[in-house]
Structures are given as structure tokens and as C-alpha cells.
């Protein structure tokens, strides 16, 4: 009695991004990025550090929401076992994989945070509104939460891409099962991290203002982006 074996077909090479395939385009992209960065730094001297940091924060949030939105759709598609999404899932996984780089662009915000978030410069006992929020709005705790957000987003995006590409080579259906389990536990954590990131990085700019829907707005906006 023979045992039939099945070897999954190799995924096309286009499925895997290699920067070496870009050729001269790579140098053009790197050059354009460096020139853009130099222009941004020049803006800090022309318009002042504070204006530069607010503009940097705007740009960071723009790309952050696109990246986190891609991760959301990957998680949702696995959670509901959506078969049709396989044609776009690799693209979403690749965009979500940018979390291994995007944290670098948060460093200027982290380093010069007191220039953006005025509450970091106010001593306890000066503003009763701020004192009532000190449990959340303390510099060290704010930075710790940022590290937790990036750690979760990076880990989740890495695991999805790892299991997905592993399934390309092995054909193991268990990879899909692991991704589904990851989604069931990860979606609540995703909602919490995305909501509090929006509160920490945007709403706390004006700590007197509050909104029960701001986190939902950021969450939904990320998915839409």
C-alpha cells in the first residue's frame, strides 16, 4: 500500500521582497530619503524645534496608522477565517512588518517629548486637572507604555509573517491554526494598545481635553487607512 505524499509548490519569488532586486532604484530611494531628512532637519532651524517636532509627530502618526491598520486586517482575516483575503494578505503582512523600522522614527518624539507634551514640564500641585491624571501622565510611565505598544505590534506582525511564509514552504495547515489563535488573543490587546497610543501621543498634547471616543476614532481610522 503506497502512501501519497504532497509537496506544496514553491511560492513565486515575487512573494519575497529583496532589496537587492531594486538595483539602481534602491540608491535613488535612499538618496531621496536622505535629502528629505535633511530638509526636515533644516526646517528645525528655520521654524524652530517645537514646530519641527509637531510636524514630525504628524508624519509619524500618518505612517503609524497605515502600518497598524494593515496589522488589524491581517488579524481580523485570520480571526474570521476569511479565505478570500489570501490574495491581499501578503501585502498587508509586508506593510505591518514595517514595525521593525517605524520605532526608529519615534525616537525624536521620545527624546524631545517635553517640547510637545507640556504636562511633562509642570510640577505636581500646580494644575489640579493634571494632578488628577498623574497616574497616567508621568514621563517614565508614558515612555514605558510606548515601549509596550511597539513590542506588541512588532511581535504580532513578526509572528504572522513568519507563520505565513513557513506555510508557503511546508504546506502545514497548523500555521493557519496558530495565526487564528494569535488573532483571538491579540485583537483585544491590539485594541488596547492602539487606543492608548492615540491617547498618549495625540490627546495628551492638551491634557485638559478628553474624549471617550478618541481611542475609537484612532482605532477605526487606522483600519480605514
Give a label for each model feature.
Residues 1-8:
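Short, charged cytosolic
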Residues 15-30, 53-58, 86-104, 142, ...:
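Alpha-helical transmembrane segments and their helix-start/interface "positive-inside/aromatic belt" motifs
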Residues 10-19, 39-61, 82-90, 117-140, ...:
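Membrane-interface interhelical loops and short amphipathic "cap" helices
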Residues 20-36, 40-41, 139-225:
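Long, contiguous internal "core" modules enriched in hydrophobic/ aromatic residues
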Residues 2, 61-169, 186:
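Transmembrane-helix bundle segments that line or gate the permeation/cavity pathway
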Amino acid at each position: 500500500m503506497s502512501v501519497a505524499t504532497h509537496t506544496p509548490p514553491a511560492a513565486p519569488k515575487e512573494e519575497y521582497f529583496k532589496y537587492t532586486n531594486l538595483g539602481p532604484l534602491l540608491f535613488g530611494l535612499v538618496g531621496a530619503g536622505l535629502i528629505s531628512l535633511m530638509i526636515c532637519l533644516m526646517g528645525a532651524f528655520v521654524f524652530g524645534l517645537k514646530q519641527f517636532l509637531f510636524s514630525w509627530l504628524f508624519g509619524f502618526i500618518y505612517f503609524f496608522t497605515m502600518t497598524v491598520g494593515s496589522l488589524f486586517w491581517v488579524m481580523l482575516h485570520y480571526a474570521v477565517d476569511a479565505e478570500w483575503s489570501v490574495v491581499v494578505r501578503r501585502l498587508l503582512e509586508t506593510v505591518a512588518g514595517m514595525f521593525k523600522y517605524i520605532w526608529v522614527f519615534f525616537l525624536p518624539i521620545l527624546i524631545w517629548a517635553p517640547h510637545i507634551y507640556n504636562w511633562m514640564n509642570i510640577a505636581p500641585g500646580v494644575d489640579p486637572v493634571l494632578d488628577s491624571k498623574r497616574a497616567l501622565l508621568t514621563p517614565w510611565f508614558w515612555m514605558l507604555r510606548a515601549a509596550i505598544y511597539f513590542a506588541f505590534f512588532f511581535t504580532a506582525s513578526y509572528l504572522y509573517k513568519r507563520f505565513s511564509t513557513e506555510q508557503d514552504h511546508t504546506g502545514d495547515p497548523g500555521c493557519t491554526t496558530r495565526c487564528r489563535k494569535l488573532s483571538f488573543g491579540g485583537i483585544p490587546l491590539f485594541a488596547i494598545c492602539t487606543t492608548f497610543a492615540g491617547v498618549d501621543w495625540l490627546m495628551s498634547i492638551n491634557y485638559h481635553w478628553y474624549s471617550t471616543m478618541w481611542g475609537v476614532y484612532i482605532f477605526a481610522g487606522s483600519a480605514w487607512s
